[in-house]
């Protein structure tokens, strides 16, 4: 005979507890620090990632048809529906999870989406576990894209610099450039200042000596890129583009 302190499976309730809901008092609005970071023009990427690290985000769940059957008059009738996390294609041919800072921003994207609050760490880990290399924050309004290096920093709660401001990246680029005498100067720029994935994350400007022939240029860039792409560099830099100038 089951006593009154057992559940339907006969497991005693004694010693068990419910996990506290960290977002029980959430008003559904954009967290203040995140709102301030998004309001900056242009956006300070380091400040944005820092704000996101301590922010609550909203994951949209979309109802999808589970099973269906034909009704008595030939119509298709839903037997069941499921809630699923959606992914979207990105301009750089990757995939991303759309997330939102507020219920209002989510409603503007899809009015019937169900908001599920989650820490930014959980969002970053969920994207990685599902094989998505980006998240898109507020795709119907701000439309800010975050790439893998930033997501890893958020997941680990680490300080992050965009690669054109990362001292290690600059030092490594200069070291590799010194091994290639035809390169006289090297400068790093933000390749994607609008965070819209329209260009590579890091723009490398190489000052080439006038003596470099067009035939040798392709070979030089291939060699430079191969040496540049160390394991550490790949962890810090999502993608690169080049701009060549005569120097």
Give the predicted meaning of each segment.
Residues 1-247:
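An interfacial alpha-helical scaffold signature
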């Amino acid at each position: 005979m089951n006593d009154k302190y057992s559940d339907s499976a006969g497991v005693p309730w004694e010693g068990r507890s419910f996990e506290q809901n960290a977002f029980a008092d959430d008003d559904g609005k954009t967290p203040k620090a995140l709102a301030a970071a998004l309001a900056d023009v242009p956006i300070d990427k380091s400040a944005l990632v820092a704000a996101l690290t301590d922010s609550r985000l909203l994951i949209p769940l979309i109802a999808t048809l589970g099973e269906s059957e034909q009704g008595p008059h030939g119509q298709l009738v839903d037997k069941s529906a499921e809630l699923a996390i959606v992914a979207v294609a990105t301009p750089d041919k990757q995939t991303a999870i759309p997330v939102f800072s507020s219920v209002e921003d989510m409603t503007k994207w899809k009015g019937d989406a169900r908001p599920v609050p989650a820490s930014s760490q959980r969002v970053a880990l969920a994207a990685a576990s599902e094989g998505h290399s980006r998240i898109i924050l507020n795709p119907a309004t701000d439309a800010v894209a975050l790439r893998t290096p930033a997501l890893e920093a958020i997941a680990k709660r680490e300080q992050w610099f965009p690669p054109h401001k990362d001292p290690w990246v600059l030092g490594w680029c200069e070291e590799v450039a010194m091994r290639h005498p035809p390169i006289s100067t090297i400068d790093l720029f933000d390749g994607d200042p609008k965070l819209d994935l329209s260009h590579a994350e890091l723009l490398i400007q190489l000052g080439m000596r006038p003596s470099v022939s067009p035939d040798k240029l392709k070979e030089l860039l291939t060699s430079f890129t191969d040496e540049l792409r160390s394991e550490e560099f790949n962890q810090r830099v999502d993608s690169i583009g080049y701009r060549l100038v005569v120097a």
